[in-house]
Amino acid sequence: MKNMVRLLLPLLGALAGSFCARFLGSEGSAIMTTTRVSFSSILVVSFLFCFHFHSFRLKGPQKKIIYLFLVFSMGFVGSLIRIEVIHLVGGLALPVLGPLVLNAIGGQALPSTGPSGSGSSSMWEEDSFELGVLEESDSPPAGGPERKRGNPR
């Protein structure tokens, strides 16, 4: 049971970090600066140091709750660091960062998805609906004068 918690909490933290970044979208990636991610990782490391330093004083459920919070926050910040590095460097760093992420959170990393949501597609393909909308760009505006298409007689 203890090993299950050790594997489940970092995965849950990484899931929460990924959900947070995906929920915010591209604007959230712009807001999530390197300074904020590094500050949160410094906070987690300092919390780890304080927990280790004062862990002999804590007994029972307090020690377990702080330990669970620490493991969850390490997974969360690790996921935010992964997202920030991928945002800054691009998808080229994934083969290098894959083993590091696996060792950091102790689980399997989720596959990166492309712009259209396909997991293994490396090339972005345009949607036929988007192409149709782009082709209709020469149509008149809603309130403007209409012109006839075809051959004028």
Swiss-Prot record:
Keyword annotations for this protein?
Membrane, Mitochondrion, Transmembrane, Transmembrane helix
**Source organism's superkingdom?**
Eukaryota
Annotated Gene Ontology cellular component terms: mitochondrial membrane
Which topology term describes how it sits in the membrane? Multi-pass membrane protein
Where does this polypeptide localize? Mitochondrion membrane
Q: What else is known?
A: A stretch of 270 kb of the mitochondrial genome is duplicated within the centromere of chromosome 2 resulting in the duplication of the gene. The expression of this duplicated gene (At2g07674) is demonstrated.
Query: What residue spans carry the region label Disordered?
Result: 132-153
Q: Give the organism the record lists.
A: Arabidopsis thaliana (Mouse-ear cress)
Note the InterPro entries from the entry. Mt_uS3-like
* Stated name of the protein: Uncharacterized mitochondrial protein AtMg01020
Q: Where are the transmembrane segments?
A: 7-27, 31-51, 64-84
The UniProt record lists the keyword Mitochondrion: yes
Q: Any keyword Mitochondrion?
A: yes
Query: Where does the signal sequence lie?
Result: none
